């Protein structure tokens, strides 16, 4: 008989819910930190306009395949992620995050539950399955105060990435060349630290405007130092054509003139056109000769993958649910 095994972690934080949400709801960073494998997704459009996402990965001796279900969420409050396995030692894997505001800050509860598909699955769940999340979540809790006050840029502690042989000298020379230009703006070292010390999930697409917000510097300075870093060979760059619905990059090119004039988003099952003012983005990544970055994802459906989606609920035909959410004043698309 397959019995679900689960574990719940609970903490009290002095930080407001939105800060804790930013850390705990980032499933890309979390999965990478616990040693989960990257995976590829095959998106299968259905006749009713919906899409079934089938993910495939390998972990140790196991070939894994599962259906990546829609992640229900209410921004800054809770999410529920479901995986239904078609191949591997597990039948199901679920995770929940619930954040409740308190007088001092908030309370967060994080639950992981899994159902084995056989004897090997039962053995895995009975031994080391929860040790990775336990280590990472306890680190997160310990680092939350420093993350909330801006002392550290990320609450996740991960081993430094493996760089190509001779990379340290190469990085040093390239930083000197950038600093000799009028476009470094004193940001060269911070950019190098970000590109060559942060998680793969953070550097596969380095967005200058996001760096500007993170570092509290003018957007133009962040853009110029990234462009200069690409010119010198510290970074690479790619132009992306973004889906107007999920905002994921569905078409890309190393040069703007080769970017497609239109694209189809398999995730959303829609066609869309290129609009330079609305859905064309320039993103950077570490130079592949120095730090090759895995292009597959650690999580394709988490809340922080589509942070502009503030409420997402999946319903069965005829089902109704009442959802409570705190939304900022503005326009929303239903």
Predicted segment positions?
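Cys/His-rich short segments
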Residues: 216, 230-296
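Short, surface-exposed coil-to-beta transition loops
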Residues: 6-8, 63-67, 90-95
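A conserved amphipathic terminal alpha-helix motif
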Residues: 1, 113-161
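A broadly conserved sequence feature marking short terminus-proximal activation segments
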Residues: 172-254
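Beta-strand/loop substructures that line and gate deep hydrophobic ligand-binding cavities in soluble
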Residues: 82-136
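Long, charge-rich boundary regions
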Residues: 273-334
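A short, structured loop/turn motif at beta-sheet edges
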Residues: 14-17, 46-47, 71-76, 98-107
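Hydrophobic ligand-binding cavity/cleft-lining segments
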Residues: 1-47
């Amino acid at each position: 008989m397959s019995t679900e095994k689960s574990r719940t972690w609970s903490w009290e934080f002095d930080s407001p819910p939105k800060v804790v949400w930013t850390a705990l709801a980032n499933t890309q960073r979390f999965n990478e930190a616990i040693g989960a494998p990257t995976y590829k997704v095959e998106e299968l459009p259905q006749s009713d306009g919906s899409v079934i996402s089938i993910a495939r990965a390998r972990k140790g001796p196991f070939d894994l395949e599962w259906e990546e279900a829609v992640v229900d969420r209410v921004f800054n409050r809770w999410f529920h992620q479901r995986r239904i396995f078609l191949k591997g030692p597990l039948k199901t894997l679920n995770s929940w995050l619930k954040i409740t505001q308190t007088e001092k800050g908030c309370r967060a509860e994080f639950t992981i539950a899994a159902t084995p598909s056989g004897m090997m699955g039962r053995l895995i769940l009975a031994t080391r399955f929860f040790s990775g999340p336990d280590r990472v979540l306890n680190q997160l809790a310990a680092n939350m105060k420093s993350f909330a006050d801006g002392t550290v840029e990320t609450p996740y502690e991960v081993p430094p990435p493996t760089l190509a042989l001779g990379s340290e000298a190469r990085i040093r020379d390239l930083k000197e060349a950038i600093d000799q230009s009028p476009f470094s703006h004193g940001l060269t070292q911070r950019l190098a630290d970000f590109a060559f010390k942060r998680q793969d999930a953070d550097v596969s697409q380095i967005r200058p405007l996001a760096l500007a917000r993170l570092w509290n510097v003018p957007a133009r300075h962040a853009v110029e130092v990234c462009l200069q870093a690409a010119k010198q060979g510290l970074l690479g760059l790619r132009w992306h054509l973004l889906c107007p619905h999920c905002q994921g990059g569905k078409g890309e090119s190393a040069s703007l003139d080769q970017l497609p004039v239109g694209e189809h988003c398999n995730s959303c099952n829609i066609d869309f056109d290129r609009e330079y003012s609305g859905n064309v983005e320039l993103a950077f990544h570490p130079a592949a000769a120095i730090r090759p970055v895995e292009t597959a994802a650690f999580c394709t459906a988490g809340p922080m993958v589509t942070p502009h989606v503030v409420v997402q609920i999946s319903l069965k035909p005829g089902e109704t649910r009442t959802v409570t959410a705190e939304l900022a004043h503005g326009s929303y698309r239903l």
